Amino acid sequence: MAGPPDSDLDDVARIRLVLARELETINEYEAYARASSNPEVRAFFQHLAAEEKEHVSEAVHMLRMLDSGQNDHFAKPFVPGHFQAAEAPAPATVHVPTPDGPAFSVNGRNGRLPSEPPTSLPPQRLLYGLPAPPPAVESHPLTVGSLRRGGGGSGSGR
């Protein structure tokens, strides 16, 4: 689905698009690493994924600086049970028999048992539960090509 041209977007919208692309790229690099049988190639893709994670942190930092409403959401703590309270009514239970055992009930959400939590992470560790740290002091605030301050990439390095 094509969106508006980049020239029609404001800075916050551009950063959100970059953030979405960075997150997708992390998934791709990590999948490539898992699929590789060569340890050196696997390490290469893990290295690339780690760099993308730094970009995600930087993009979130920029969003927090530019969008006070978004920043308010990052600063808001999540209490245990927050996500369970927000769930819609459970879908109809589907009974799936096991090949050589009794039937058990699955609620249809990613094949999880009804008693299984959606994540094993504590609520305060979820993406929106922790504020993103600012970029490291010794690092460039922006590290992508022409955006990099002090040179790098093919841009002017202003």
UniProtKB/Swiss-Prot annotation:
Gene Ontology molecular function: any one: metal ion binding
Q: Does the keyword Iron apply?
A: yes
Localization terms from the record:
Encapsulin nanocompartment
Which residues are involved in binding Fe cation 2?
A: E22, E52, H55
Q: Where is this region: Disordered?
A: 92-158
Q: Where is the composition biased (Gly residues)?
A: 148-158
The record's annotation in InterPro entries points to: EncFtn-like, Ferritin-like_SF
Recorded GO CC terms = encapsulin nanocompartment
Q: Where does Fe cation 1 bind?
A: E22, E52, H55
The record's Gene Ontology biological-process terms are:
intracellular iron ion homeostasis
Task: Tell me which family the UniProt entry assigns to this protein.
Answer: Belongs to the ferritin-like superfamily.
Q: What does this protein do?
A: Cargo protein of a type 1 encapsulin nanocompartment. May help nucleate Fe atoms in the interior of the encapsulin nanocompartment. Present in about 36 copies/encapsulin nanocompartment.
Official protein name in the record: Encapsulin nanocompartment cargo protein EncB
Name its species. Answer: Myxococcus xanthus (strain DK1622)
Q: Which gene encodes it?
A: encB
